């Protein structure tokens, strides 16, 4: 038995945690047997102030679940010795002895091809085949065992045209598990029905996708760029959101939601790197206001409508009929494959030759001395590097919501609130990046990958 870091335990087995148990016990250390066939956990009882241990083995669907436990041990050392003995005992048993008897179906495998090679999405092939993305691949391979394919087409879409959208759903699953929520596995709609010590949230994921049959409008001149950002992109985001708002079966009326705040999680994939600008553009669209600086003063404009060619959409998503049933809109321009790669390396996954360096620009308002945005640079490969799944998340709160989402239900995110005069109040975490890119080095070749876009060969 050897000790492992918490991020690795979380990646391998964190999805099986019952959130309520953490109000009774505190996790103290994490362990694994040779080859990680078994995992171990030592906990401290918050009430009795003694220690316990848990052994986890893979069930018939290859998910780590508890197979043995004990409590009321007087010290950490006693719990560790008892856990070591238990892991040695269970390590001698066959895999079948770890099965629970309640499993249905076979283990989920996102990477076993279910379509011809010609149909595989380029981003899926990058994840599945490129050594420099092996940390992300191994991380997703650990996560996939806990995924419930309620609509029956997740794997096919993940491998083909829906790769980006499905990765966005996996990001949300990882982020809200990290925060301390558990997913209701029998809920078909919306995408995630979550409960935990912080309350309940229902989330439907949506994406702005590439236009069908036509190209994205050119935006090379200043005039074209201004029109593209002020109107074309907001219209794309508007249609992604209103598609969910006007769903034939309103999500907020689903039995599984049952009065929980209903949130739409939006990502922009309409063009390569489109999510780079999603936060300011989506903020303007959902609130229906635009801020600018004129002669050193903030000018607030009520937008009214977005118009681009024959395309028109009213601005102010939260002002639309029935939008009062949407508690908030969630964004994260950094919730992409590159984050999966970094989080995988933090957990010790992937080819050990892979090295990553992350640099970018972060918000500075939390710094009373110098509130300006600041540059950062971090070596992801160093043991002291930390990053959370929720980092980079922005929550746009609906001022008209019938069921408001409380900010403390999504801690460590950036929360934005529209004020009656059109100003926007920001509640910021200690570190909130605007954007970043990650340089991935393998065998002397470096690839610099924006969190929000595709790879570019550096050197």
Task: Report each predicted region and the residues it spans.
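Conserved short loop/turn motifs at secondary-structure junctions
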Residues: 158-161, 189-193
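Acidic-basic catalytic patches of nuclease active cores, encompassing PD-(D/E)XK
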Residues: 149-184
């Amino acid at each position: 038995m050897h000790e492992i870091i918490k991020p690795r335990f979380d990646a391998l087995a964190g999805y099986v945690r019952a959130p309520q148990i953490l109000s009774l016990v505190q996790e103290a250390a994490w362990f694994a047997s040779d080859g990680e066939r078994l995992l171990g956990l030592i906990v401290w009882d918050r009430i009795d102030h003694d220690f316990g241990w848990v052994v986890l083995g893979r069930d018939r669907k290859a998910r780590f679940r508890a197979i043995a436990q004990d409590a009321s041990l007087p010290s950490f050392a006693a719990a560790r010795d008892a856990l070591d003995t238990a892991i040695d005992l269970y390590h001698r048993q066959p895999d079948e002895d770890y099965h629970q008897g309640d499993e249905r179906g076979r283990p989920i495998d996102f990477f076993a091809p279910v379509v011809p090679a010609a149909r595989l999405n380029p981003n899926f092939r990058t994840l599945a085949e490129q050594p420099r993305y092996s940390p992300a691949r191994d991380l997703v391979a650990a996560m996939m065992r806990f995924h419930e394919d309620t609509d029956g087409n997740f794997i096919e879409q993940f491998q083909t045209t829906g790769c980006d959208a499905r990765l966005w759903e996996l990001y949300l699953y990882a982020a809200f598990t990290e925060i301390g929520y558990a997913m209701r596995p029998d809920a078909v709609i919306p995408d995630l029905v979550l409960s935990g010590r912080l309350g309940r949230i229902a989330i439907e994921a949506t994406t702005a996708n590439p236009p069908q049959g036509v190209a994205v409008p050119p935006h090379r001149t200043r005039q074209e760029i201004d029109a593209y950002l002020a109107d074309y992109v907001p219209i794309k985001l508007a249609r992604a959101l209103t598609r969910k708002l006007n769903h034939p079966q309103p999500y907020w009326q689903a039995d599984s939601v049952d009065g929980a705040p209903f949130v739409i999680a939006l990502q922009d994939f309409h063009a390569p790197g489109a999510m780079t600008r999603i936060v300011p553009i989506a903020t303007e669209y959902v609130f229906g206001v635009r801020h600018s600086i004129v002669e050193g003063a903030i000018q607030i404009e009520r937008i009214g409508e977005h118009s681009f060619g024959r395309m028109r959409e009213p601005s102010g998503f939260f002002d639309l009929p029935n939008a009062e049933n949407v508690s908030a809109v969630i964004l994260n321009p950094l919730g992409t494959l590159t984050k999966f790669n970094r989080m995988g390396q933090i957990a010790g996954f992937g080819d050990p030759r892979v090295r990553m360096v992350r640099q970018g620009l972060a918000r500075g308002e939390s710094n009373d001395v110098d509130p300006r945005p600041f540059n950062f640079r971090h070596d992801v490969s160093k043991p002291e590097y930390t990053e959370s799944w929720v980092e980079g998340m922005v929550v746009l709160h609906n001022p008209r919501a019938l069921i408001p989402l409380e900010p403390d239900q999504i801690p460590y995110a950036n929360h934005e609130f529209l004020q009656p005069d059109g100003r926007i109040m920001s509640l910021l975490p200690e570190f909130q990046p605007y954007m970043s890119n990650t340089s991935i080095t393998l065998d002397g070749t470096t690839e610099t990958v924006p969190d929000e876009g595709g790879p570019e060969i550096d050197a």
